[in-house]
Amino acid sequence: MTTILENLPAGQKVGIAFSGGLDTSAALHWMRIKGAVPYAYTANLGQPDEDDYDAIPKRAIQYGAEGARLIDCRAQLVAEGIAALQCGAFHISTAGVTYFNTTPIGRAVTGTMLVAAMKEDGVNIWGDGSTYKGNDIERFYRYGLLVNPDLKIYKPWLDQQFIDELGGRAEMSEFMRQAGFEYKMSAEKAYSTDSNLLGATHEAKDLESLESGIKIVNPIMGVAFWRDDVKIDKEEVTIRFEEGRPVALNGVEYKDAVALLLEANRIGGRHGLGMSDQIENRIIEAKSRGIYEAPGLALLYIAYERLVTGIHNEDTIEQYRENGRRLGRLLYQGRWFDPQAIMLRETAQRWVARAVTGEVTVELRRGNDYSIIGTRSPNLTYQPERLSMEKVQSMFSPRDRIGQLTMRNLDITDTRDKLRIYSQVGLLAAGESSALPKLKEDESGN
C-alpha cells in the first residue's frame, strides 16, 4: 500500500511543517479552502534569521490551521550535533575544509520530533516543503515512518492541482492577498538559505553557477571575512572538553549545551570561521553545490580533533576517521537512527570520545585562518621525552633500535621479491631514475 498521497485528502487531518514563510502559508490556506483540516507544526531550531517564534503558530491559525504547535527542538538538535562531532560524522570536505552536515542533523531532529507531536494529536498525514529533486524529501520520509509506521505523506508540491493553481511565489503572494492577508512577497535573493542553530546552508539560483562564489553570500552567522572593509581582530579562545563533551569556553562553564553552542557561534562568527564552499553528491547521485556556515561547530571541532590526535593511538584514529566518513554519509542520507549508524556512533562515543578530556587554546584570525597555541590534557599519550634529541633518560636505547631495524629485514626482503615479480611480468617499467634496474642486476648476481 502506498504511503504517498498525490491528491489532497479532503476532510482529513493533515499536518504541515510550518515555517511561516510564503510557501507554507499559502499551502496551509489552500489546503483549508480545498477541504482538508490542516494542523501546523513549527520547529524551533534556533534559526539565526528568525526573531519571533511565538508569532508563527498564531499566523498559522489566521491562515486556517485547526491547531498550531511550536516544538522546541534546540536541546535535541545540539545533542545530535555534539554526537556527530564526537564521531567525526562529516564526509564532505574540500582541501581539508569541512561541511559539518548541519542540515542533515536538523532534518533528523525535525523529522522525528514533529511527527511525534502529530502522532500525539492523532494526525497521521504529513506534508512539508521539500521538493522531489532534493535530499530532504527522502530524509523526512524515512524519519517520519520510523516514528509513525501508519504515516501517510501528502506534499502540496507534488500535487498537480496545487502546482497548476499556485505554481510560483508571485501566484502564492497574490493568492494570499486576495484572501485578505496582505502577505507581501519578500525580496528575491540571489540564492536560498536554510538554517538552524548548528549552521546555515546557502544554495540554488545564482549559486548553481560555479562561476559565482562565496562573495555573493551575505553571512547570517558571522562576518564576510573576505571583505577588506570588515575589521577582524585576532582573538584567543580556550575550549575545554570533559569525556568528549564541550563544557567551557574561555574558563566559563556551561551547564546548558545550547548556551555553550550559541557562545561558540558568536566567537567563531566574529571571524567567519567555519564557512566552506562544497560540491557534493545528493542522495540521488546528482551533484549539487552549497556554501555553508557553522562557526560554533568549527571551533569545537578544532579543539576536539586536537585532543583526539594527542590522546589516541594511530590505529584508533584511523578507525575514528574511516567510520566517521561512513557515518557522515549515513547521516546525509537520512539514516542517522538506522542500526548501522547507531553501531558506528556507539563505538566512537564509547571508545574515542570518553577519553577526550582537556583544553585547547586557539588563535582565530580571518575565516578559517587559525593557529593552535596550547594543548593540555591529563590523558595525553604525547610525551616528548620519549623522542627527545636531548640527553635524557630514554625509554629505549640505540641497541634496541638496531634490533628493531634488523627485524624489518624480513618484510624488506618480501617487498624486493614482489617487485622482481612485478617487473618480470611487465607491471613495472624500469626508468632511468628507478631502482628497478638494480633489482634486475641483483638477480644475475652482480
Swiss-Prot record:
Alphabetized SUPFAM superfamilies for the sequence: Adenine nucleotide alpha hydrolases-like, Argininosuccinate synthetase, C-terminal domain
Single GO molecular function: argininosuccinate synthase activity
Keyword Ligase in record: yes
Catalyzed reactions per annotation: L-citrulline + L-aspartate + ATP = 2-(N(omega)-L-arginino)succinate + AMP + diphosphate + H(+)
Any one GO biological process: L-arginine biosynthetic process
Record-listed L-aspartate binding positions: 131, 135-136
Binding site for L-citrulline: 99, 135, 139, 192, 201, 203, 280
Pfam families for this protein: Arginosuc_syn_C, Arginosuc_synth
Pathway linked to the protein: Amino-acid biosynthesis; L-arginine biosynthesis; L-arginine from L-ornithine and carbamoyl phosphate: step 2/3
Keyword Magnesium: no
Matching Gene3D superfamilies: 1.10.287.400, Argininosuccinate synthetase, chain A, domain 2 (3.90.1260.10), HUPs (3.40.50.620)
CDD domains for the chain: ASS (cd01999)
Location(s) in or outside the cell: Cytoplasm
Major subcellular location class: cytoplasm
GO CC terms in record: cytoplasm
Entry-linked PROSITE patterns: ARGININOSUCCIN_SYN_1, ARGININOSUCCIN_SYN_2
Summary of subunit composition and partner proteins: Homotetramer.
The protein's name in its UniProt record: Argininosuccinate synthase
Gene that specifies this protein: argG
